[in-house]
Regions:
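Flexible "arm" and connector segments at domain edges
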Residues: 2-76, 80-124
């Protein structure tokens, strides 16, 4: 059995982090409109799903070359915005949880087994 190395990313969030700036602006936008009352975790998760569907719709019945990049940017921004707001609701650091997930995936998908294949980790 091969031993997997645990390569771990170091998290280095500065006060000028793009994620922190985006969250600050999103919360300011939300709070100016008194919308926090509607932004409970359930509804934020539903909004992510709906906006993800709208993003998918940009590709429906088209090749990726025919997709409208302007619309893709808008829908992707919505998905990201609701994701950041949901993370904030739970006090989660978006960059930190992304890096944690990458580390988990490194263990599930070692390069020597997963390179060049789309197989799921339990089929490698």
């Amino acid at each position: 059995m091969m031993k997997l190395s645990r390569k771990v990313f170091k998290l280095n969030l500065s006060q000028n982090s793009i994620m922190k700036n985006a969250i600050t602006e999103l919360k300011k936008f939300r709070d100016e409109r008194d919308w926090d009352q509607f932004h409970n975790p359930k509804d934020l998760a539903i909004a992510i799903s709906i906006e993800s569907g709208e993003l998918l719709e940009e590709f429906l019945w088209k090749s990726h070359h025919d997709a409208n990049i302007g619309n893709i940017k808008k829908e992707l921004a919505d998905v990201l915005a609701y994701s950041l707001l949901l993370a904030d609701k739970y006090g989660l650091d978006p960059e930190g949880i992304i890096l944690e997930k990458i580390n988990e995936n490194r263990l599930k998908y070692p390069v020597e087994k997963s390179k060049g294949t789309a197989k799921k980790y339990d089929q490698l």
